[in-house]
Amino acid sequence: MDSRLLVVLIPVLAAASWAVYNIGRVALQQFRKMTS
């Protein structure tokens, strides 16, 4: 594994996982509002 590839991949993966986490959290709140 090339270290330069990791330097590029780590921030991209961090940003992607952060986006998925935020979207999932908001979606869950909306879902709870609809069901309650």
Swiss-Prot record:
Which topology term describes how it sits in the membrane? Single-pass membrane protein
Q: Say yes or no: keyword Membrane present.
A: yes
Q: Name one GO molecular function term.
A: manganese ion binding
What highest taxon heads this organism's lineage?
Answer: Eukaryota
What Pfam families does this protein map onto?
PsbY
- Which GO biological process annotations does it have? photosynthesis
Its localization reads:
Plastid, Chloroplast thylakoid membrane
Which InterPro entries has this protein been placed in? PSII_PsbY
Q: Which residues cross the membrane?
A: 5-23
What is the stated purpose of this protein? Answer: Loosely associated component of the core of photosystem II (PSII), it is not always seen in crystals. PSII is a light-driven water plastoquinone oxidoreductase, using light energy to abstract electrons from H(2)O, generating a proton gradient subsequently used for ATP formation.
Question: What's the family?
Answer: Belongs to the PsbY family.
Question: Quaternary form?
Answer: PSII is composed of 1 copy each of membrane proteins PsbA, PsbB, PsbC, PsbD, PsbE, PsbF, PsbH, PsbI, PsbJ, PsbK, PsbL, PsbM, PsbT, PsbX, PsbY, PsbZ, Psb30/Ycf12, at least 3 peripheral proteins of the oxygen-evolving complex and a large number of cofactors. It forms dimeric complexes.
Q: What is this protein called?
A: Photosystem II reaction center protein Y
Organism of origin is Pyropia yezoensis (Susabi-nori)
Upper lineage is: Eukaryota, Rhodophyta, Bangiophyceae, Bangiales, Bangiaceae
